[in-house]
């Protein structure tokens, strides 16, 4: 059994506030001699002064001219793009190409012998990721597996943990969960002989509010937990960017006898996680957003160590069988322990190679340091949006106004801010793209913007704001 991950030092992981960000900006403005906090020159100074600025050099950062819809008459093709879309797809680490090439060369030279030979034998390749992935989710090696894709892992885990009874059969999730989660839960309920109408509970925010209050989630579990089989929330809500209090939700669910699991698609490699210490029952994630492993790359799952030798029914395959006797092939299952027993098939080396390449970056910088950097990046973005586009701001120079639906409290958000526009985004979004911006649209009027702590900087954010000001005037004219 491996050692437990470090215990979190405090209950509220992020202690940053908007006041601290403002103090930081004013301090840096004084040092630079720049009085206006919205001055693009301050962004240059902030980026040059950033202790983690060289992490960006570990990534391939796209030029504006390589983006398919950028207009060369509006943006210099040789300039860096404004890539603020890592919440959808992270950028490629330079190490990834090298790792992939090594395994392609190995395939060419060894063929089938690559399964058991070489520096990273393919039959064991996922195991080489476990320590690094365990650090990112706050888990022991035995509690994590690198396998499948996110939705497949939702099915794998719910098949095993969702055992409805006549009195306890409901699954609680947030309203407007990501569609794949919603469909997976619907199908699991039907497969277990229940109806979605009776067994699926989607918790809505209060009227007039965009995000769920933690106290409302906990109150619902306390009042209705005896009927709930599983509480299954996102770690970070994909649309609003809200970071849920996973520790508090887990404690509330356990007090009422519920299993508690999380979809960490937008939390993995974004914010520090402590799944082991939070006592979470199970969780799963994709790795291609903040994990930077490439489109559709391999996912992962977590099962708490208390289920290490648990024999609950599950979806099985030959990779569920212990490696020590797997190739005896006598068709007598020798179930692997912990999360390894939830694997089904052999890992695809090319997507595992992408994970290995990404983990080389996280070997050089801690997620805790990245989290601190993230708070100041999003705080700077928030300041600029509120100052230059806030509905009641005296410095707003356009009729277009923008509000932020992501929570203001830093401990309730990660890298992403979801911007809500006073005008439909049908014109706004294409004009941003023409000018070399990569952001993410959600109709009718939300654009998700994610300054990723690994490779974005203050200049990227200020350039985005400048483009947004330009586009706002186009919207006014049309």
Swiss-Prot record:
Highest taxon in the source lineage: Eukaryota
Residues with N6-(pyridoxal phosphate)lysine modification: 289
Compartment(s) of residence: Cytoplasm
InterPro entries reported in the protein's UniProt record: Kynureninase, PyrdxlP-dep_Trfase, PyrdxlP-dep_Trfase_major, PyrdxlP-dep_Trfase_small
Thylakoid is among the record's keywords: no
Enzyme class: hydrolase
GO process annotations (BP): 'de novo' NAD biosynthetic process from L-tryptophan; anthranilate metabolic process; L-kynurenine catabolic process; L-tryptophan catabolic process to kynurenine; quinolinate biosynthetic process
Major location (coarse): cytoplasm
Residues annotated for pyridoxal 5'-phosphate binding in this entry: 150-151, 178-181, 234, 263, 266, 288, 318, 346
Known catalytic reactions: L-kynurenine + H2O = anthranilate + L-alanine + H(+); 3-hydroxy-L-kynurenine + H2O = 3-hydroxyanthranilate + L-alanine + H(+)
Disulfide-bonded cysteines: none
Pathway the protein acts in: Amino-acid degradation; L-kynurenine degradation; L-alanine and anthranilate from L-kynurenine: step 1/1; Cofactor biosynthesis; NAD(+) biosynthesis; quinolinate from L-kynurenine: step 2/3
Keyword Lipoprotein: no
EC number, UniProt record: 3.7.1.3
Keywords: Cytoplasm, Hydrolase, Pyridine nucleotide biosynthesis, Pyridoxal phosphate
GO molecular function, one term: pyridoxal phosphate binding
Cofactor: pyridoxal 5'-phosphate
GO-annotated cellular components: cytoplasm
Classification via Pfam families: KYNU_C (PF22580)
Xref: PANTHER family: KYNURENINASE
Family according to the record: Belongs to the kynureninase family.
Chain's role: Catalyzes the cleavage of L-kynurenine (L-Kyn) and L-3-hydroxykynurenine (L-3OHKyn) into anthranilic acid (AA) and 3-hydroxyanthranilic acid (3-OHAA), respectively.
Description of how the protein assembles with itself and partners: Homodimer.
Protein name listed in UniProt: Kynureninase
Organism of derivation: Caenorhabditis elegans
